[in-house]
């Protein structure tokens, strides 16, 4: 079991910054990191 855990650590490390696959699958994170794109909905003023 210990070997398996160590092997999976290479593919999925504890650091969030080194998990591009996880953030890709996480739609919530995608929506949260929409800083570069323009907002789809702009509330009317007034």
Curated annotation (Swiss-Prot):
GO terms for cellular component: endospore-forming forespore. HAMAP family: SspN. It comes from Halalkalibacterium halodurans (strain ATCC BAA-125 / DSM 18197 / FERM 7344 / JCM 9153 / C-125). It is found in: Spore core. Residues 1-46 are annotated as: Disordered. Keywords: Sporulation. Induction: Expressed only in the forespore compartment of sporulating cells. This is Small, acid-soluble spore protein N. GO terms for biological process: asexual sporulation; sporulation resulting in formation of a cellular spore. InterPro entries: SASP_SspN. Its main location: other. Signal peptide: none annotated.
């Amino acid at each position: 079991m210990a070997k398996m855990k160590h092997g999976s650590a290479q593919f999925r490390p504890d650091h969030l910054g080194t998990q591009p696959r996880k953030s890709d699958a996480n739609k919530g994170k995608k929506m949260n990191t929409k800083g570069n794109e323009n907002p789809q909905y702009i509330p009317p003023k007034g």
